[in-house]
From Swiss-Prot:
Pfam family, one: RM2_Med14
Protein name: Mediator of RNA polymerase II transcription subunit 14
Gly residues: bias regions: 1503-1512
PANTHER family in the cross-refs: MEDIATOR COMPLEX SUBUNIT, MEDIATOR OF RNA POLYMERASE II TRANSCRIPTION SUBUNIT 14
Gene source species: Caenorhabditis briggsae
Transcription in keyword set: yes
Length: 1540
């Protein structure tokens, strides 16, 4: 059985000990080398082994040296053998087979040279030290010491070097020791191999060989299986473990349970007479009887047989006693204890006559003991915790089952007790015990002394709580003590009202004072339920008040007489009155000072004051103290005494408060009497009950004294300034009674103010301290020069009185010193005087002249408010600036502000619309000039005359000054580098003087001069030269009768800036052809700089903004916008000139035009027709954009060469012109003009009629229309933020791309884009299916779109009509039918490209419109290396780029036209208005060249980095235009200007 493991172990042993045998052989060889046998050996072992040992050793060497090793031993060099010829042992070393000792494994060594060097250095050091020491020893004794030192040094040195000599000699024979080192290393290595082998054997035995044993075969079961064919010898344990015994059926279970229930009920009925009544429940079910005693225990018993001798079996015991305060409801009896009780009780039941009764008495006794122990534990916890000072356990006897607890403990010390001991005496006790006579009863409670409704213990529930019982007991004891105290208090003072208050915590409430109404002044007496002590409290008093604490101790003690109670109540009443006085002055400018805070010399003066007193210090006059003393006299009489203490430096004195001295003679005397109340009167005795209501009188006295002190300081400061004052008594109803009257101000007024003081009846200063400490400056006037008046018919606005009194507050008195207060009074008076001087002169002319032009809203001597204007809705507010009186001040004398108010005509009307039309007072622009004028002349008559005369024209002219931005994005991209903020202010309105204004738009400057006689002069003062063609005709159209030209023309100075401020511009000969036939100029459009004289009505009509054709404008605004648009149109056409093109051309562009002639009132240009001839076309189209003299707005005239365009009918030409006026001109975008020119050049196959139909469809859209068609003129690339024309042609002029926006209405946010390419030469619309891998971002048309294109091409080839209108009509019809719905999708409805050419080519990637370089700039570098398509085929995708369609890209021209300006909130867009360049200054980076042709079209000084381009341009990328509304064009969502 063990053969296999043994064999495996031997094999492993042989394997592991292979290396060990080799090392053993080497060791034996080394030992044999020293023996004579080794020296005599002449030949090797036949097996090749170096060593040959006898077989008796039991070990044979199976490994021999190789042939190379044998040669090594036989062929030793003579040199190696001759090195140590003197010693024969070196031959043995040469043949030593022992292994070399690795470094670090042998004994430690040190080189000989290091040892010698160390010895030499040591000797040298000793010699050096010895030489230094010998120099110090000079006497005889030193000589002896030197000799001894030399001897010692020589002996030590000789001994050291003798050791070195011995060591050197030993080195010759030291090599014999190397064999010992090798032997030691070899033995250590072999020992390690043995250890590793043993460890491996143990690991194999415990792991791999654990199961390598033969099993014990069962012969007998094998025979049974082979002979009988069955296995009958399985252990029964297996069957019992896996096969459960058979169960009885449910019916049998019910029968058995019913029988057991019958037997149990029968046996219990026999014992019923002896069952204790404590068993409240006996329940028999399922063969088990459950007996329950509430709060104690529950047992379950049964019978295990039917015979009479069957004993009761106790199944379970459950203890119902619980403790939720300490044990948290956990079981109080351990399971082992229950098991022991179960065993004892079962044995007693077996021998008992009545087992049920026996079980009850045993368990009942145990549960009662357990309940008492629980109560004791709870009491111990409370006695050691929160009630440790209030309860004490006097007795606990578990045998007698008694617990006595004392509560409300009194601790006292007695001389008989040991030092540190305290006598503990409980006032009340509670005893918990078990009655010996009542065996069936539980724990009982007895209180000492007895009282009704005391706490008990509920033992039946099982939830015992000593805390609850004590809490109920404390509540009853507190009520008992309070009732006893109530009887004591009522007996001591029968008239005292004592009420029992409180529901949860009962208290006694006593009203000490007769007028006490709040609970804060009630004396409350309560009992501490924990310790039983009496607590007295008054909320207004400190809880640590000595009288309250002493009164509470007196009530708690057993010796408290009635007289003692009355004394304490009297003290408490006095303290309460004092607290009333203290609180009454809390809000006054005084603070209570403790006596410990006073200086020593002040404390000396307080010896004369009463002991019960309050010391108050005035916060504003800190050297004055008011001492309020209380002197009790008798039982119900008290005297209040006031004393004023003045402290100056280190001296203090009392100031008497009597009634003998007059007020104006003594500053602070008679302060109390002035309040009509005497605080000290020896004849009158004031009782305490009367004194309790006099705290308000004390407050009045304090304030009165302080007022006198303040008046004293103020009068002194006024007299220092030279102002005459007089302190007088006024009427008694005036608070304070005194007023400081001002009598003389001649020394502070720089001019004669006699007229002012004739009107001034009274000027005084009163002190108002009712709510806060303020001074009221009162001025009483008669015969006021100006009073309030309003137009007739306004009943609720009555006229002002000629006699009135103004009372104005001098604020911030609390933070001001008397000097600042006096300065404020003088400033207030100076304001009155200066205002009166100006107003008095104006009042003389007001009644005679100005009353019909303006009205006085209010005049209060410090401010004048006048309403003027036609509706009296403009306000002028005038006030005097007191800061101008400061020495060296540059402030204006007068503060003049302008505002608006509701028109007087709307005061009584039910509908008020003044909020719908915000008003702006234009005189606010020149408020500074008006202030300077008033300061210079002090003439308010001239100011009011100017305001009334100029308000009407300024109202309309001032509307140009409102902030309105215009976009310059398209222009900045077109003519130069794009700026960061492509917006500029539309207008600049500058004020030169009171009569001269300048209105600037771009490089156009108009000067408006206000003249007398309601006349206005307007002239063109633009820099370098006049630019307003037809300016006189504009005003003459409004009023030809009164408009005239005044004087000679004024020269405009040349530019002072000769340096180029921008890129070089082209000269006229570079982009204009020579005019063969000069154009005849209209004399009405004459350019002049002469002033044009007109009336106010004319300028008002010219500047009155009204809503016309859906946009808000006025004639002058329309005129200036047209002049500016012509200049920008010329810049746009310059970029379309062939000569302007530089560098390689783009695949798509807007075509070339040639400017023929350009004047300030018109621009003429021409271009070739797009009739299918491509670049070889010769037919021309002639354009003229001009300023119409009748309408003073831009119009266009288009003319085709005769016979070249059959569709150029008057109807179609009218449609093209109207579209320009309503859409292209109104939107103000340069790229829109380029798209318009391209579309009007297409003439092939009746394209002019199709274009005219599209334009008419856009302009004639009604609100009921279900399909809205709009041409897209400008394309905005949201990725590159660039703009481009939406309509372009290729370089060969054979293909044109058109975009049409289709939506349900102009207001619809959802829309679709119909994008197609029109083949000019073939008049068809076609497509090409391109994969996305071939052309990026190009969408393959759907089958429905392909079918639609085929249908259109078939129709146009049959009828010969133009395919543009045919396609649009078909799409719009299907759109109305609901086949297509607007969707804002990223792909267009129709995505078409040019048809493929006969030769195949690869389409290059698409280029976004923003990436197309404008004319005159080089194409992108990356496009130059791309493969170009054939010249006859348009490059697919080069225009459209990513097929991204959104409201920002196509939202610009979804409407008929755009406003001439972009209404935008300046706070949300761009820099403030001040950052926009003003005329006359050329900012860095200006885009205009002063010396070029551009300077005549645009003011170089008005174009800065942030204000590039002309007016009217709209950026559809950054500000989306809303769609059309019912009334035409809708405006931006910001505030409209002018207001509707």
């Amino acid at each position: 059985m063990n053969n296999i493991p043994i064999k495996m172990s031997l094999d492993f042993f042989v394997f592991c000990f292979g290396q060990s045998e080799k090392l053993s052989s080497q060791l034996r060889g080394a030992l044999a080398a020293d023996s004579p046998a080794m020296a005599a050996r002449s030949s090797l072992d036949p097996t090749g082994s170096v060593l040959s040992l006898d077989e008796s050793s039991g070990i044979s060497d199976h490994e021999g040296f190789s042939s190379a090793e044998q040669d090594n031993f036989s062929n030793r060099k003579p040199e190696d053998q001759a090195k140590n010829s003197s010693d024969s042992e070196e031959d043995v070393e040469a043949k030593n087979p022992l292994p070399d000792v690795p470094p670090g494994c042998g004994p430690p060594t040190i080189p000989l040279n290091v040892l010698l060097d160390f010895s030499i250095q040591h000797v040298y050091h000793e010699i050096t030290v010895l030489a230094e020491l010998m120099q110090r020893k000079t006497n005889d004794q030193g000589e002896q010491e030197r000799k001894m030192s030399l001897v010692h040094f020589a002996h030590a040195t000789r001994s050291q070097f003798l050791k070195l000599v011995a060591l050197v000699k030993w080195i010759r024979v030291s090599k014999r020791m190397d064999v010992c080192y090798s032997i030691d290393y070899l033995l250590d290595l072999q020992s390690q191999y043995f250890i590793d082998t043993a460890d491996r054997l143990v690991a194999m035995t415990r792991g791999d060989l654990e199961l390598a044993r033969l099993p014990e075969y069962h012969i007998a079961p094998a025979i049974d299986v082979l002979v009988l064919g069955t296995y009958n010898r399985m252990p029964s344990k297996i069957k019992e473990a896996f096969i459960p015994p058979a169960k009885i059926t449910p019916r049998e279970q019910k029968q058995v349970c019913a029988r057991l229930n019958q037997l149990i009920e029968t046996r219990l009925s026999r014992l019923s007479s002896g069952i204790p009544p404590n068993y409240k429940e006996i329940h028999v079910a399922n063969g088990i009887a459950t007996l329950l005693v509430p709060g104690e225990f529950e047992i379950k018993i049964t019978l295990l047989g039917e015979t009479e001798m069957t004993k009761w079996s106790l199944l379970n015991i459950k203890i119902l006693v619980e403790d939720y305060e300490l044990g948290m409801g956990l079981p109080l009896v351990h399971n082992l204890q229950l098991n022991q009780i179960h065993g004892v009780l079962q044995s007693r039941m077996d021998v008992a006559v009545n087992p049920v009764k026996e079980a009850f008495f045993n368990l009942h006794s145990f549960c009662v003991s357990l309940q008492l122990d629980v109560l004791y534990c709870q009491t111990s916890r409370m006695a050691a915790g929160r009630l440790r000072e209030n309860i004490v356990i006097e007795k606990y006897d578990p045998k007698e089952r008694m617990l006595v607890v004392g509560y409300w403990v009194k601790r006292s010390k007695n001389k008989r007790l040991t030092v540190g001991q305290v006598k503990i005496d409980a006032q009340y006790r509670v005893q918990i015990y078990e009655d010996k006579d009542d065996k069936l009863g539980g724990l009982k409670v007895r209180h000492f002394p007895h009282a009704p409704r005391l706490g008990t213990i509920d033992c039946a529930s099982g939830m015992l709580s000593m805390d609850r019982m004590l809490s109920e007991t404390f509540a009853v004891r507190c009520s008992e003590r309070l009732m006893r105290l109530r009887r004591i208090l009522e007996a001591a003072e029968p008239l005292l009202e004592v009420r029992m208050t409180g529901s949860n915590v009962p208290t006694l409430s006593l009203s000490l004072l007769p007028d006490t109404s709040s609970n804060e002044e009630m004396l409350t007496v309560s009992v501490n339920s924990f310790c039983g002590k009496v607590i007295c409290n008054i909320n207004v008093l400190n809880s640590e008040n000595d009288d309250l604490v002493a009164f509470a101790k007196a009530l708690y003690s057993s010796r408290c007489s009635g007289q003692t109670i009355r004394d304490y109540l009297q003290k408490l009443r006095t303290s309460l009155v004092i607290e009333r006085y203290r609180r009454s002055v809390a809000a006054l400018p005084v603070r209570e000072i403790k006596e410990t805070e006073l200086l020593p010399f002040v404390k000396v003066m307080l010896r004369e004051a009463p002991k019960q007193r309050i010391i108050l210090q005035y916060t504003r006059s800190e050297n004055y103290y008011l001492i309020v003393g209380f002197i009790p006299e008798g039982e119900d009489v008290v005297t209040t005494k006031l004393q004023l203490l003045e402290c100056d430096d280190e001296r203090a004195q009392f100031i008497p408060l009597d009634n003998d001295t007059e007020v104006f003679q003594t500053a602070v005397a008679d302060a109390v009497e002035q309040g009509t109340m005497r605080f000290k009167n020896c004849d009158d005795r004031i009782s305490l009950l009367e004194e309790c209501s006099r705290e308000q009188r004390l407050a009045f006295a304090i304030i009165t004294v302080e007022d006198r002190i303040t008046y004293m300081y103020l009068a002194t400061e006024l007299q220092k300034k030279g102002v005459g004052v007089e302190l007088r008594r006024d009427d008694a109803h005036v608070p304070g009674g005194l007023a400081l009257h001002i009598t003389n101000v001649k020394t502070v007024v720089p001019f004669d103010a006699a007229e002012f003081f004739k009107c001034c009846v009274r000027s005084c200063l009163r002190l108002d301290n009712r709510t806060r400490h303020t001074f009221q400056f009162e001025m009483c006037f008669e015969n006021i020069p100006l009073v309030r008046d309003v137009p007739h018919g306004l009943a609720h606005r009555r006229e002002g009185d000629k006699d009135t009194t103004w009372v104005q507050e001098i604020s911030q008195v609390n933070q001001m010193t008397p000097e600042k207060l006096v300065e404020g009074i003088i400033h207030r008076l100076m304001r009155y005087l200066y205002m009166y001087k100006v107003v008095h002169q104006f009042s003389l002319a007001y009644e005679q002249y100005f009353k019909q032009w303006c009205n006085v809203e209010v005049y209060t001597f410090h401010k004048l408010v006048v309403s003027y204007g036609e509706n009296r809705d403009m306000l002028m507010v005038l006030a005097f600036n007191v800061k101008s009186q400061n020495p060296g001040s540059q402030e204006d004398y007068f503060l003049m502000n302008f505002g608006q108010t509701m028109p007087h005509s709307q005061f009584n009307t039910p509908e008020v619309d003044w909020l719908k039309k915000p008003r702006y007072n234009p005189h606010a622009m020149m408020s500074q000039l008006l202030r300077d004028e008033l300061k210079k002349n002090n003439d308010l008559i001239y100011i009011m005359h100017y305001l009334c005369e100029t308000i009407r024209p300024f109202m309309v002219i001032g509307k140009f000054g409102r902030i309105r931005f215009q976009s310059q994005k398209s222009l900045s991209q077109l003519i130069g580098p794009e700026v960061f903020f492509p917006y500029r202010l539309k207008y600049h309105l500058a004020v030169l003087d009171l009569t001269t204004l300048r209105l600037m738009r771009g490089n156009v400057i108009l000067e408006i001069k206000m003249l007398e006689g309601q006349k206005v002069a307007v002239r063109d003062v633009s820099r370098y030269r006049a630019r307003c063609a037809g300016l006189y005709q504009l005003f003459s159209n409004i009023d030809p009768v009164t408009t005239e030209i005044m004087c000679e023309e004024l020269e405009i100075p040349e530019s002072d800036n000769k340096i180029n401020a921008g890129p070089t511009m082209w000269k006229p000969e570079q982009f204009m052809d020579a005019v063969d036939v000069p154009h005849e100029d209209d004399p009405r459009m004459k350019i002049t700089s002469l002033p044009i004289l007109m009336t106010h009505d004319t300028i008002i009509k010219a500047c009155d903004f009204q809503e016309i054709d859906g946009h808000v404008t006025c004639p002058l605004d329309e005129y200036l916008y047209s002049i500016s648009y012509l200049q920008r149109a010329l810049l746009t056409l310059e970029r379309m000139s062939p000569r302007a093109q530089q560098g390689p051309a783009n695949n798509l562009f807007s075509g070339y035009v040639t400017v023929v002639d350009a004047k300030p009132d018109y621009v003429r240009f021409k271009a070739t027709q797009l009739n299918g001839d491509g670049t070889n076309a010769t037919a021309m189209v002639y354009y003229k954009i001009y300023l119409c003299p009748e309408a003073m707005t831009l119009k266009i005239h288009i003319e085709y060469d005769e016979g070249t365009n059959s569709e150029a009918t008057p109807k179609n030409l009218t449609a093209l012109s109207t579209y320009f006026e309503k859409v292209v001109f109104r939107c103000g975008d340069e790229y829109a003009l380029q798209s318009y020119v391209v579309m009007t050049r297409v003439t092939s196959f009746g394209a002019t009629a199709s274009i005219a139909n599209l334009m008419n469809a856009q302009m004639d859209i009604s609100l009921e229309s279900k399909c809205c068609l709009q041409l897209s003129l400008t394309y905005n690339n949201t990725t590159s933020k660039k703009l481009a024309p939406a309509t372009k042609v290729d370089q060969q002029l054979n293909n044109m791309i058109i975009n049409v926006i289709i939506s349900q209405s102009r207001k619809a946010d959802s829309f679709s884009v119909l994008r197609f390419i029109y083949r000019i030469k073939e008049w068809v619309i076609c497509y090409s299916c391109l994969k996305k891998s071939e052309v990026n971002f190009v969408t393959v048309p759907s089958e429905l779109n392909k079918q639609l294109i085929d249908d259109v091409n078939t129709e146009v080839k049959t009828t010969g009509k133009c395919a543009i209108w045919a396609l649009v009509s078909l799409v719009s019809d299907r759109f109305r039918s609901g086949e297509w719905n607007p969707s804002n999708q990223d792909e267009p409805i129709i995505s078409t490209v040019a048809p493929p050419a006969p030769q195949q080519y690869v389409n290059p990637p698409s280029v976004a419109p923003g990436s197309i370089a404008p004319p005159g700039s080089g194409a992108p570098q990356q496009q130059q290396h791309q493969q170009q398509p054939p010249p006859s085929v348009m490059q697919p995708g080069s225009m459209m780029g990513p097929q991204s369609v959104n409201a920002h890209q196509y939202g610009m021209h979804r409407q008929m036209g755009g406003p001439p300006s972009m209404q935008m909130n300046p706070s949300s867009v761009g820099p403030p208005p001040g950052s926009v360049g003003m005329p006359g200054s050329v900012g860095p980076g200006s885009m205009m060249n002063p010396g070029s042709h551009q300077q005549h079209m645009m003011n170089p000084g008005s174009v800065g980095p942030g204000s590039v381009g002309g007016p009217g341009s709209v950026n559809p990328g950054s500000v989306g235009y809303p769609p059309w509304g019912p009334g035409g064009q809708q405006y931006h969502h910001h505030m409209q200007y002018p207001p509707q």
